[in-house]
UniProtKB/Swiss-Prot annotation:
Keyword Acetylation applies: no
Function according to Swiss-Prot or TrEMBL: S-adenosyl-L-methionine-dependent methyltransferase that acts as a component of the wybutosine biosynthesis pathway. Wybutosine is a hyper modified guanosine with a tricyclic base found at the 3'-position adjacent to the anticodon of eukaryotic phenylalanine tRNA.
Family of the protein in this entry: Belongs to the TYW3 family.
Alphabetically ordered keywords of this record: Methyltransferase, S-adenosyl-L-methionine, Transferase, tRNA processing
This protein's GO CC annotations: cytosol; nucleus
GO biological process: one example: wybutosine biosynthetic process
Protein name: tRNA wybutosine-synthesizing protein 3
Key word Transferase present: yes
Record organism: Schizosaccharomyces pombe (strain 972 / ATCC 24843)
Matching InterPro entries: tRNA_yW-synthesising, tRNA_yW-synthesising-like_sf
Amino acid sequence: MNIKGIDVSFDAQKKEILEGLKSSVPDASPKGHPDSPIFPLLDVINSHPDWVTTSSCSGRISVYVQGANSRKGGGYWLFVSHQAHEELPPVLEDEKVEYGKVPSSPVEGNREIQYAFEPMILHVQTRSLANAQHLQRVAASCGFRETGIQGSEQKFIVAIRTSLRMDIPIGCLTASEKLQFYITREYMCFLFKRSVEYFTENGNRMARLKEQLERQVEKRMKPRRKLRNMDDYLVQS
């Protein structure tokens, strides 16, 4: 039920979502549950009476094999982590891995491999459109300028996001299941070390966001002084 832009069922939905976070029930994240680096930020957001998180990712690096038909799924991760890594993981150091193999043209049956850094993304349901618009402004001021609002009269979702990312085709999985990388091993090492810088900046933006949202929670929870008479009003003015 919606009255003047306020979703009166929000409290019930928030209670259900928070109970799910405490249990083993999967959320809307690809992993099915939040990753630990983002827990402190989630705690702050969920302490606000007008917000609740619905899905999240603190940021990650990955080496991903596309599906046979990239539009229909079927891909998988060779490596994925929510932490910075300066050293190559064992899967990329295997003696069967071939580096510096650049095909002259696309080969049918090969599946592309992508290297990616993805920044923090967070979806927050809000009690009202006004709450969503305010949260959007706060997030944008902290470096999450691609933040947007999705929703209807029944539900408002703020997608907090930023453009701090890398997405690079680096190789292929052949029809015979061989890993062939277009780049050299040295360049692969460079990508992993470069991602450390991205993780650092991503963490800085998350810290700024957490600090600003803590202030918003404090303001929201602070009791308002009731004016008892006209003299109080004149003093306030």
